[in-house]
C-alpha cells in the first residue's frame, strides 16, 4: 500500500530521502522487502469460523478469542503504521497478531499475545478516555491529588534517633519498652521518694558529654597543659547559667546528685537538710578527679557561706579559714569525725566509711604545684613560706615588687573565738616536701624574716614563773611568732607563686634544685582510672575518661593518651521538679521561683534550655579557635537534646536545593525536547510538554507525601533530603519514554486515535518499570529500621502517584498539545502559527479535500510536489537522525560496533572482569555505619561522634533482670553467677580481682547488711539484747544494732523477734542474704542506704515503700518490698573499636543472657552498643531475604506481563549482575554494608529494571534474526533509556549538596554508580546476550518470512463496535483521497470508516 507521502516511482527518489524512522534500517538489514509492504486480500481468506472441537485448550482459545481478538482492524491505520506493524507486530497491536495466527499466517506465543492484547486494550481504552475527556481527567485527578496534599499540614518530623533506628516490634524494641510497658501494666504511682538515675537512651539521655581532643597531632593529653585546660573548661561548665522562668539555673541545679543520708526529723541536724543538699556535689565522670584541681569545679554553686550552717559553722574547727564552704579546701572525713564526736551519726558514719568518703580531694596531687590553693596534704605540695624573703629579694632585684595581699577584716564574734581556740588547741600537721630532707627545713625562728614585726613585749616578772609556766609562756611565744609568720607568708603567697610561674629561669637563685616544685607523673596517677569524692563506689575506668590510652608494656602504667572525656549526669525532669518543690518546714531552694507555676513541664524546659546553651557555649568556646582566629576544634560537646535539635533543624525541606534541582531537571527536559524554526519554537517542539511533565511529577510527589502523612508515616532526614530528588529522577523516566514515542505515534497513527495508540504501544514498558520500581521500595520496608521503612514506604507511595499521573494527567496534557499541533501552532507561544500552515499539508492537520476525488497517474507528480516540502521538514527532526545526534551515533556507529563478533567477545570479557572485580570488592566489604555520618557535617553532634569514634572505644551497658516473676530471695546465687558470667567477657572492664569494675545493688546490699550485722554483734557482746525474748535491754544501743534488730524481727508480713534475734544471720557465711526477710531487707537498704542505691544504678521498679527507723523498737516493722519487676546491673565495655568487634561483643553477651534466660532468670542486655548495632546480627539475613523477594517479584511481574519466563529470567540475571557489581563497588570504595546501604542494594534491583525491560520488550516484539532484533531494539530504546538515566542522575545530583554525609555517600555516590552500572549492563551487555541467547520472538510469520503481513480489514459490522472510529477530532477523519495503485488487483480495499466500492482498478488510500 502506498501513502500520499510516497507516490509510485518516488520511493527511491533522492529528493524524498528517508521518510520515517525505519527508512534507514536497510543499514541494519531490518527493512522489509518492498513487495511485502502490500497484500492482496481474497474474500475466501476472510475469517472463517473455527469448527468447535472437544479440545479443552482449543475451547479456551476460542473463549479468549471472543473477547481479545477481532476488536482491531487493519483498515484503521495508515501505511506508515502498517510498516511499523510488519517490523514489530506485537508492539503495535497484539489483536492483529492473533488474527494472523488464527488465519494460519503466523505462529508464536499465543499466551503472551493474549496477555499483551488484554493490556493493550485496557491501555487503548484509557488513552481514548483521556483523549475524549482531557480537561475532565486533569481536573478530577488534580482534585484528588489536592485532597491528598491537604495531609501535609499534619507532617511530623521524627527526630528521636532511637525511634528512627530501633526496629519496631522486634526484640530490641520490646526490651527498650519493657520498663514503660511494665509501669503501665502495674500502674504504680510513685511518691517523692527521691530521684531516679537518668536512663541512657542510646546517645546520652541523662548523660552530657565533653571530649577534649589535642591541639596538634601527637600532643599528649596527660600533661599539665591539657589537664589544666580541662579544669578551666569544667569550671566554665559548672558556673554556666541560663535564665528560665525569671530564675538563673546552673549545672548544680539540674545535675544528678546522690541523695544525701537521711536525717531523722527529730535529729539536731534536721535543720541542716538544705545545706547538706547543697554540699553534696554533682556526679560527673572526669579525668581531673585524679587530682586536687578536680574539686575546683564542684563548687558548691552558688557559693555556700559558712553562716548557712548557723552556730555549727563557727564551732567546727575542721572547716577552712575562709568564709565559704568549698570542695577545694573541704575535708569531709575531718568534718564528719568532728560531728560524730558531738552527735552520734550511727549507720550514717559507717556509710561514709563504706563509700570511701575520706579527705575528699585534699590528699590528691596537684596538677600545678604552684597553685596557691594546693592543699598541704597533696603529695607534691610546695611550701613557699621558707622562700618568701628570697623570692621578694630576687624579684626586686629584677625590677618586680611583690604585691601584698590585704587581709580581709571579717570582724569578730564569739563563735569565731571558740572556733579559733579549738584550732589553736589542735596539733597542726607538719608538711614536708617530698624532695626536701626533714633536717633541711628551717626552723620557724630561722624562717621568720627580720622585718616581720614580732611581739617583743617583755614577760612580766613581778612574780617568779614556775618551770611549767615558763615553758608554757615560751610555747605561747613560739605560737605567736608562727602565727605572725603565717600571716606574713599568706600576704605574699599568691604573688610569690605568680612570680615563680613566670620566672622559672630564676629558680636557681631562690632555692636549690632539690627543693624545686615538683610535677607528679600524671600518667602514673591516672593508671587504672580516677575516683570521685567517694572513692570506693565512684570509680571512673581509664577507658572511659582517656582516649586511646597508651602503655609502654602490657599491664604496665600509662605512658600517654590522646584525648580527655568528661561525662555529666543530668537529672530527670521529675527529679528536678521534686528537688525545688516546696517542702514543709524547709526554705525555698530557689529564690524567685514561682511555686504555683512550678511543675515537671517547667522543669523539663529548664533542662532543655541549659543543655542547648551548654552545647552552644562550648561549641563556640574560644578554645576552639587558634591564635590567628582560625577554627581549631578541640572541644566537642554533646547533650541529650543536641541530636534531636540538630535533626529537627536539618530535616526541614531545603527549598533552595529542591528548587535548584527541579530547575535543573526542567532545563534538561526542555533542552532535549526543543525544536526551533526561525528562532521560534517549532510546531513539532515539545518544550511545553517537558515543562508540564516535570510539574506533573512534582505535583504527584507532593500529593504522595500528603497521603503518606495521612497514613501516619513520619518524616525524617531521608524523607526531606532524598525522596524529592529520587522520585523526581525516577518519575520523569516514563515522561521521556512517552515523549520519545509521541512524535512517532503521531506520524504513524495518521490522525486516528493517537493517544490510544501511544498508550497502547508505550504503556507496557511503563507498566513493567513502574510496577517493579514500586515493588522494590515496598520490599525495602522489610528491613526493620523505622527510618528506612518510612523512606521506602514514602518512596513507593510517591512512585505510585507518579505512575497514576503519568497514565492520566500527563496523557491528557499530551492530548491538548496534540490539538495544538494539528492547528499548526507553535510550542509555548501558541498564539503564533507555523510558517507552513497555510500552504502545506500535514499528517496531523489535513486540508479538506473532496473525499471522492480520483487522482490519476498524470497528476501524481503535481500532488506530491505539493506535499514533498512539508514532508521533508517534518521528518528531519525525528525520522532521519540528525547529524551529530545521539540517535545518529547509535544507529550508524554503536549498533554496527556491538554487532561484530569480536566486539561481543570483548564486551563479555570486559563485563566478566568487572564482575570479578566486584567479587573482590564484596570480600573487602565490612559492616558498619559511623554514627557521625547520619548527622550533618559541621555540627556539634557530628564532630563529637567522630571524635568519639576516633579516640574512645568505651560503652556503658546494663544487664536488666526482668520480673516480677523472679524469686530474688532464692535466686541470689544465680544472679551472682549471671553477673560474673557477663563480667568474664573480654570486653567487660574488670578490677584487680577480675570482677566487673562496677558494684551492683545485690552486692552493695550484702555489704551493708554485713556492716549492720557487725554492729549488732558488738552490742550483743555488751549484753544489749535479750536473745531469748528478742527485746532490747540496753540503754544506749547503737543505731546499727537497733537497725539489725528491726531487720531480724521483720520477715514477710510478720514482725516477731522471739527466736530470731541473735539466732539468724542477716548474711550467712556463703554470702547469701537471709531469704525469709529478703524483701524486708530490700526496703530497709533502699531507705537507709539509698545513696548506695543510686550509686548502684539499680533503677528498681516498683520502688520499695518508705520506711525509717523509730526509737521505739517495737514499732520498727519493716514492710516487705514488692517483687522487683525491673532491676539492672551496670557494666562498662571497652575495646569496641569497630562494628565487627561490637557485633562480636553483642553475640558474646547475648549468648550469656540467653543461657540464663533458659535457666529461669529472664534478662536482657541494654546499652548504646545494643541499641545501634543489634540489627547487624540480622542484617545479612534481612538483606538476602529482601533481595530474594524483590527478585522473585520482578521475575513474576515480567513473566505475567510478557508471559515469557525466559525473558524474565534474562532480566533477573542482569539485575543480579548489577546488584553484585554495585555491592562490589561499595566494598572497593570503602562504603560499608549497613541498613542504609542495604536499602540501596534492594532498590537497585527495581531501579535496574529501567535499563533492561525496555530493551527486552522491544526485542521480543521485533521480527528477524536475534541479531536483527537486537539491533532494532537498541535503535528504538537506547535514546529514551539514556534520557531516563540522565534525568535520574540529575534528580540525585542535588543529593551531593546535602549536609548529611550518609545522603552523599550512600545515595548520591551509590545511585550514581548504579546508573553507570545499569547503562553498562542494560545497553551494552544485555544486547550481546540477547543476540546469543535471547528469547524467541512473540510471533513468527509462516513461510520463513521476516515480516508479518496484516490481516484483511474486519467486516463493517464486526468493526462497528470498536472504539476509536469516532474518538478523535473532526480533523482526524480520513480525507477520502483516492489515487491509482501501481497494481490493479481485482478486489476492493476500504479504509477508515468510509468503506465502499471504488472500482476494480482503484483503491481508497487510508488516512494519513
From Swiss-Prot:
Q: What is its main location?
A: membrane
Annotated TM spans: 137-157, 650-670, 687-707, 710-730, 766-786, 796-816, 902-922, 1176-1196, 1218-1238, 1239-1259, 1277-1297, 1306-1326
Region (Disordered) spans which residues? Answer: 1-20, 455-479, 1342-1408
Listed InterPro entries: HMGCR/SNAP/NPC1-like_SSD, SSD
Q: In which tissues is it expressed?
A: Germ line and its progenitors.
The GO biological-process annotations, alphabetized, read as:
cell division; molting cycle, collagen and cuticulin-based cuticle; negative regulation of smoothened signaling pathway
Give residue spans on the Extracellular membrane side: 158-649, 708-709, 787-795, 923-1175, 1260-1276, 1327-1408
Signal peptide from the UniProt entry = none
Subcellular localization is given as: Membrane
What's one GO MF term for it? hedgehog family protein binding
Q: Name one GO cellular component term.
A: plasma membrane
| Function noted in UniProt | Required but not essential for cytokinesis of mitotically proliferating germ cells.
- Entry similarity comment: Belongs to the patched family.
Q: What is this protein called?
A: Protein patched homolog 1
Q: Give the lineage.
A: Eukaryota, Metazoa, Ecdysozoa, Nematoda, Chromadorea
Gene symbol of the encoding locus: ptc-1
Amino acid at each position: 500500500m502506498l501513502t500520499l507521502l510516497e507516490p509510485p516511482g518516488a520511493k527511491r527518489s533522492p529528493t524524498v530521502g528517508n521518510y520515517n524512522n525505519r527508512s534507514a534500517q536497510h543499514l541494519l538489514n531490518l527493512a522489509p522487502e518492498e513487495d511485502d509492504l502490500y497484500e492482496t486480500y481474497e474474500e475466501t481468506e476472510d475469517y472463517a469460523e473455527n469448527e468447535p472441537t472437544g479440545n479443552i485448550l482449543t475451547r479456551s482459545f476460542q473463549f479468549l478469542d471472543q473477547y481479545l481478538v477481532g476488536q482491531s482492524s487493519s483498515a484503521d491505520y495508515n501505511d506508515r503504521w502498517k510498516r511499523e506493524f510488519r517490523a514489530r507486530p506485537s508492539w503495535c497491536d497484539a489483536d492483529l497478531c492473533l488474527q494472523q495466527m488464527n488465519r494460519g499466517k503466523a505462529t508464536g506465543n499465543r499466551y503472551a499475545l493474549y496477555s499483551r492484547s488484554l493490556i493493550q486494550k485496557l491501555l487503548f481504552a484509557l488513552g481514548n478516555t483521556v483523549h475524549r475527556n482531557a480537561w475532565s481527567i486533569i481536573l478530577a485527578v488534580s482534585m484528588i491529588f489536592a485532597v491528598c496534599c491537604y495531609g501535609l499540614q499534619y507532617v511530623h518530623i521524627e527526630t528521636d534517633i532511637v525511634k528512627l533506628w530501633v526496629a519496631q516490634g522486634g526484640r530490641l524494641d520490646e526490651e527498650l519498652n519493657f520498663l514503660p510497658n511494665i509501669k503501665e501494666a502495674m500502674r504504680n504511682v510513685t511518691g517523692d521518694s527521691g530521684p531516679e538515675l537518668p536512663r541512657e537512651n542510646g546517645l546520652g539521655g541523662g548523660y552530657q558529654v565533653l571530649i577534649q581532643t589535642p591541639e596538634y597531632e601527637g600532643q599528649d593529653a596527660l600533661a599539665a597543659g591539657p589537664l589544666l585546660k580541662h579544669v578551666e573548661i569544667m569550671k566554665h561548665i559548672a558556673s554556666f547559667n541560663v535564665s528560665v522562668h525569671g530564675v538563673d539555673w546552673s549545672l548544680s541545679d539540674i545535675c544528678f546528685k546522690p541523695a544525701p543520708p537521711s536525717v531523722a526529723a527529730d535529729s539536731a541536724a534536721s535543720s541542716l537538710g538544705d545545706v547538706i543538699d547543697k554540699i553534696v556535689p554533682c556526679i560527673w565522670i572526669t579525668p581531673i578527679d585524679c587530682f586536687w584541681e578536680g574539686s575546683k569545679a564542684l563548687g558548691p554553686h552558688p557559693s555556700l557561706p559558712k553562716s548557712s550552717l548557723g552556730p555549727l559553722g563557727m564551732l567546727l574547727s575542721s572547716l577552712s579559714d575562709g568564709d565559704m564552704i568549698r570542695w577545694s579546701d573541704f575535708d569531709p572525713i575531718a568534718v564528719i569525725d568532728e560531728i560524730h564526736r558531738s552527735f552520734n551519726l550511727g549507720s550514717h558514719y559507717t556509710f561514709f566509711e563504706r563509700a570511701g568518703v575520706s579527705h575528699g580531694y585534699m590528699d590528691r596531687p596537684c596538677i600545678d604545684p604552684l597553685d596557691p590553693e594546693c592543699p598541704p596534704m597533696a603529695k607534691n605540695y610546695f611550701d613557699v613560706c621558707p622562700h618568701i624573703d628570697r623570692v621578694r629579694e630576687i624579684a626586686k632585684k629584677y625590677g618586680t615588687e611583690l604585691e601584698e595581699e590585704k587581709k580581709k577584716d571579717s570582724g569578730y564574734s564569739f563563735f569565731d573565738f571558740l572556733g579559733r581556740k579549738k584550732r589553736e588547741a589542735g596539733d597542726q600537721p607538719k608538711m614536708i616536701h617530698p624532695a626536701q630532707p626533714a633536717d633541711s627545713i628551717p626552723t620557724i625562728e630561722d624562717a621568720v624574716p627580720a622585718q616581720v614585726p614580732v611581739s617583743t613585749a617583755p614577760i612580766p616578772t613581778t612574780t617568779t614563773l614556775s618551770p611549767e609556766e615558763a615553758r608554757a609562756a615560751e610555747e605561747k611565744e613560739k605560737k605567736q611568732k608562727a602565727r605572725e609568720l603565717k600571716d606574713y607568708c599568706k600576704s605574699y603567697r599568691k604573688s610569690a607563686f605568680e612570680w615563680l610561674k613566670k620566672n622559672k629561669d630564676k629558680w636557681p637563685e631562690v632555692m636549690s634544685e632539690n627543693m624545686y616544685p615538683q610535677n607528679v607523673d600524671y600518667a602514673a596517677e591516672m593508671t587504672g582510672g580516677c575516683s570521685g569524692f567517694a572513692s570506693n563506689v565512684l570509680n571512673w575506668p581509664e577507658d572511659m575518661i582517656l582516649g586511646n590510652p597508651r602503655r609502654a608494656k602490657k599491664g604496665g602504667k600509662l605512658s600517654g593518651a590522646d584525648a580527655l572525656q568528661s561525662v555529666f549526669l543530668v537529672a530527670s525532669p521529675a527529679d528536678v521538679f521534686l528537688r525545688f518543690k516546696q517542702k514543709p518546714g524547709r526554705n525555698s531552694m530557689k529564690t524567685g521561683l514561682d511555686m504555683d507555676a512550678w511543675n515537671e513541664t517547667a522543669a523539663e524546659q529548664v533542662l532543655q534550655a541549659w543543655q542547648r546553651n551548654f552545647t552552644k557555649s562550648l561549641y563556640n568556646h574560644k578554645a576552639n579557635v587558634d591564635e590567628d582566629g582560625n577554627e581549631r576544634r578541640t572541644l566537642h560537646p554533646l547533650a541529650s537534646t543536641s541530636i534531636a535539635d540538630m535533626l529537627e533543624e536539618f530535616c526541614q525541606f531545603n527549598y533552595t536545593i529542591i528548587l535548584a534541582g527541579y530547575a535543573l531537571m526542567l532545563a534538561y527536559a526542555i533542552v532535549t525536547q526543543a525544536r526551533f524554526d526561525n528562532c521560534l519554537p517549532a510546531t513539532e517542539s515539545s518544550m511545553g510538554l517537558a515543562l508540564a511533565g516535570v510539574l506533573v511529577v512534582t505535583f504527584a510527589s507532593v500529593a504522595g507525601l500528603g497521603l503518606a502523612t495521612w497514613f501516619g508515616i513520619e518524616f525524617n532526614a531521608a524523607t526531606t533530603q532524598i525522596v524529592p530528588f529520587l522520585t523526581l529522577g525516577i518519575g520523569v523516566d516514563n515522561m521521556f519514554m512517552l515523549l520519545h514515542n509521541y512524535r512517532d505515534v503521531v506520524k504513524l497513527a495518521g490522525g486516528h486515535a493517537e493517544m490510544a495508540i501511544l498508550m497502547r504501544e508505550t504503556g507496557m514498558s511503563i507498566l513493567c518499570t513502574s510496577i517493579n520500581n514500586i515493588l522494590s521500595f515496598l520490599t525495602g520496608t522489610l528491613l526493620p529500621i523505622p527510618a528506612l521503612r518510612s523512606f521506602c514506604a514514602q518512596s513507593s507511595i510517591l512512585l505510585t502517584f507518579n505512575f497514576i499521573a503519568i497514565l492520566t494527567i500527563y496523557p491528557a496534557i499530551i492530548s491538548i498539545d496534540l490539538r495544538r499541533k494539528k492547528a499548526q501552532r507553535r510550542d509555548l507561544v501558541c498564539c503564533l502559527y507555523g510558517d507552513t500552515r497555510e500552504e502545506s499539508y500535514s499528517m496531523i492537520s489535513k486540508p479538506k479535500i473532496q473525499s471522492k476525488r480520483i487522482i490519476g497517474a498524470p497528476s501524481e507528480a503535481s500532488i506530491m510536489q505539493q506535499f514533498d516540502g512539508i514532508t521533508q521538514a517534518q521528518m528531519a527532526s525525528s525520522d532521519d537522525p540528525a547529524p551529530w545526534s545521539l540517535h545518529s551515533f547509535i544507529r550508524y556507529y554503536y549498533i554496527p560496533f556491538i554487532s561484530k563478533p569480536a566486539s561481543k567477545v570483548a564486551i563479555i570479557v570486559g563485563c566478566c572482569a568487572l564482575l570479578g572485580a566486584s567479587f573482590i570488592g564484596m570480600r573487602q566489604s565490612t559492616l558498619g555505619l559511623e554514627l557521625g555520618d547520619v548527622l550533618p557535617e559541621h555540627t556539634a553532634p557530628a564532630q563529637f561522634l567522630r571524635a568519639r569514634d576516633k579516640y574512645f572505644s568505651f560503652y556503658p551497658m546494663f544487664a536488666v533482670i526482668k520480673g516480677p516473676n523472679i524469686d530474688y530471695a532464692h535466686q541470689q546465687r544465680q544472679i551472682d553467677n549471671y553477673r560474673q558470667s557477663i563480667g568474664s567477657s573480654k570486653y567487660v572492664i574488670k578490677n584487680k580481682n577480675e570482677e566487673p569494675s562496677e558494684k551492683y545493688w545485690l552486692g552493695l546490699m550484702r555489704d551493708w547488711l554485713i556492716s549492720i550485722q557487725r554492729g549488732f554483734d558488738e552490742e550483743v557482746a555488751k549484753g544489749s539484747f535479750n536473745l531469748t525474748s528478742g527485746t532490747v535491754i540496753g540503754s544506749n544501743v547503737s543505731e546499727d544494732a537497733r537497725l539489725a534488730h528491726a531487720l531480724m524481727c521483720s520477715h514477710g508480713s510478720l514482725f516477731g523477734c522471739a527466736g530470731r534475734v541473735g539466732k539468724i544471720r542477716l548474711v550467712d557465711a556463703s554470702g547469701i542474704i537471709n531469704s525469709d526477710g529478703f524483701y524486708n531487707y530490700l526496703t530497709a537498704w533502699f531507705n537507709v542506704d539509698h545513696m548506695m542505691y543510686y550509686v548502684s544504678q539499680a533503677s528498681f521498679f516498683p520502688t520499695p515503700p518508705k520506711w525509717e527507723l523509730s526509737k521505739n523498737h517495737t514499732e520498727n516493722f519493716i514492710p516487705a518490698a514488692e517483687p522487683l519487676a525491673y532491676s539492672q546491673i551496670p557494666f562498662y565495655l571497652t575495646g569496641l573499636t569497630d562494628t565487627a568487634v561490637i557485633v562480636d561483643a553483642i553475640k558474646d553477651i547475648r549468648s550469656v543472657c540467653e543461657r540464663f534466660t533458659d535457666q529461669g532468670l529472664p534478662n536482657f542486655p541494654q546499652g548504646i552498643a545494643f541499641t545501634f548495632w543489634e540489627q547487624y546480627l540480622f542484617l545479612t539475613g534481612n538483606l538476602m531475604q529482601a533481595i530474594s523477594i524483590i527478585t522473585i517479584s520482578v521475575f513474576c511481574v515480567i513473566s505475567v506481563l510478557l508471559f515469557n519466563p525466559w525473558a524474565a529470567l534474562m532480566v533477573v540475571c542482569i539485575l543480579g549482575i548489577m546488584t553484585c557489581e554495585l555491592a562490589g563497588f561499595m566494598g572497593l570504595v570503602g562504603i560499608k554494608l549497613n541498613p542504609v546501604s542495604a536499602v540501596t542494594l534492594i532498590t537497585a534491583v527495581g531501579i535496574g529494571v529501567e535499563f533492561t525491560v525496555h530493551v527486552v520488550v522491544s526485542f521480543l516484539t521485533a521480527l528477524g534474526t536475534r541479531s536483527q532484533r537486537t539491533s532494532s531494539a537498541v535503535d528504538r530504546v537506547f535514546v529514551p533509556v539514556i534520557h531516563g538515566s540522565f534525568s535520574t542522575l540529575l534528580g540525585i545530583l542535588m543529593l551531593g549538596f546535602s549536609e548529611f554525609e550518609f545522603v552523599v555517600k550512600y545515595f548520591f555516590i551509590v545511585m550514581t554508580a548504579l546508573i553507570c552500572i545499569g547503562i553498562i549492563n542494560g545497553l551494552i551487555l544485555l544486547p550481546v546476550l540477547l543476540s546469543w541467547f535471547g528469547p524467541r520472538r512473540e510471533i513468527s510469520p509462516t513461510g520463513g518470512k521476516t515480516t508479518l503481513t496484516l490481516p484483511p480489514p474486519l467486516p463493517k459490522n464486526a468493526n462497528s463496535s470498536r472504539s476509536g472510529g469516532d474518538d478523535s477530532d473532526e480533523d482526524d477523519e480520513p480525507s477520502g483521497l483516492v489515487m491509482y495503485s501501481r497494481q490493479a488487483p481485482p478486489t476492493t480495499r476500504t479504509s477508515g470508516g468510509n468503506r465502499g466500492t471504488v472500482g476494480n482498478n482503484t483503491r481508497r488510500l487510508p488516512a494519513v
